[in-house]
Amino acid sequence: MHPTEVTSYCWPHHARIEGAGSCRRTTCSTATDNRQYVLTCRCVSAGGFWRPFGHYQGRLGALVTISHRDTDTVFIDELRKTCESTNINFLLGAGCSMPEFGTLGNIETLWAQLKTSETKERIANEHGDHANLIENIIEASLKASFFETAILPNRDYIKTNTKETKENYELFCRAAMKLVAKREASTLPKQVTFFVSNYDICMDVALDMARIPTNSGYVGRFNPLVDLSDFGRRVTTSTLTLGYQSEIASANLVKIHGCASWRKKGGGIEFSNEFDLIEEIERNIDNLCQTAQQANPTQDPGLQGGLFPLNSNTFNELIEQATTHAHKFDSDSVNKLLDSFKKLQIVWPTKQKFHDTVLDEIYYAQLRRLTNQLEVRNSVLIVAGFSFADEHIRKLILRAADTNPTLKVIILCYNEQSERDIKENLLSECNTIPNDNVTTVTAMKPGTGHIQGNLDLNTVSTLLKMVSK
């Protein structure tokens, strides 16, 4: 029996349990209509308490079947069988790069509110001639917070002692590649595709450290350019005497949102290890703050180290902060900082991704590649460190799960709270997953299994090692 944790917003009345064993079916009707719906239930205690294996929502009786599993031996055996016979894909989010890199929190939500016509009208009415400055300060503040969380740590990632994160990524890459290294059937490639929603260089460094042949989307050695045709190439080795060829395990690396190391060059984008742009942006942030301090020597502690500490949880608080500090900033310095942000070749975490970036073509191509991979028969997408707050990726994955019944989406959740947040994000998008092919996974409680505690990247690596045995 596998314990099931499901958020059930509307568990219908008049439910009737049928069948026997650890898995039963429930026929039920709602109080608002007389239609009959069938839900799968599993026993969650020795006393025979039953709970719906999925999510029932609303009067129309739509059923969302998001399965839950624990990292017990049965799940590990099933995952082993899945990986032996499928095309393997991973989706890695910001949670994998902690503690060196932070998560973005509610920045995307605040950004979306800034761009609404209602917000622009409100700022214009309240601040008149200073409305543009207030709006620019808010945008610069959000981008500065994002920069310090997701971009700035890349500069020192290679040089400084970030041993824990580097080792975790390298161990993960090695464990993931072992899933395909011993494959003998030519119908399945010895290849793993890694989709990364982060902006960091952690996977780039880890694949190099593990010496894994990688299709990374870069062409050239001294000044590598981003070339999206450089994917899917399989690596083989052959003997000199007999000419026998065998495939070597290789990886595809897809940076969906771009990378902190990408730079504009002519009509293309190059990969650079110089990080000079990051240093330029950091200088502009520091100069802006120093200018504010010089103009206001009695500055209150609300301006420390950056434009705003962004400890505001709501947009109203953010507007209040911007209004309070507006007189401290020179508009030219704010605009200079915003111009330097535009040089970053990344897809900013806004809901208007398709409208405010020069990377539209690359972004579309990366999403198409993710779509194409998930449409392949007998594929699995293993997700780690990703909250599904990203609207575009969330919709894409749910659509693929709907149209491809042979696809399995396995979401490795950091802890139970993370699982609840992920389910909430998924259920906000749709009210049915008819193929029952989306599963959330949490680790066993301490003392109850081999994989226990929180499913961070290191624990995920341990899980994959057990799967590849």
Kindly give the residue locations of the regions a language model identified.
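SIR2/sirtuin-family catalytic core signature
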Residues: 59-90, 243, 311-337, 344, ...
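Extended, H/D-rich, highly charged conserved domains that either
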Residues: 192-346
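Gly/serine-rich nucleotide phosphate-binding loop at the start of the catalytic core
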Residues: 56, 61-224, 246-249, 254-257, ...
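Residue-identity detector for glycine
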Residues: 19-21, 47-48, 54, 58-61
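Cysteine-centered motifs
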Residues: 10, 23, 28, 41-43
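A short acidic (Asp/Glu
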Residues: 99-104, 203-208, 265-267, 391-397, ...
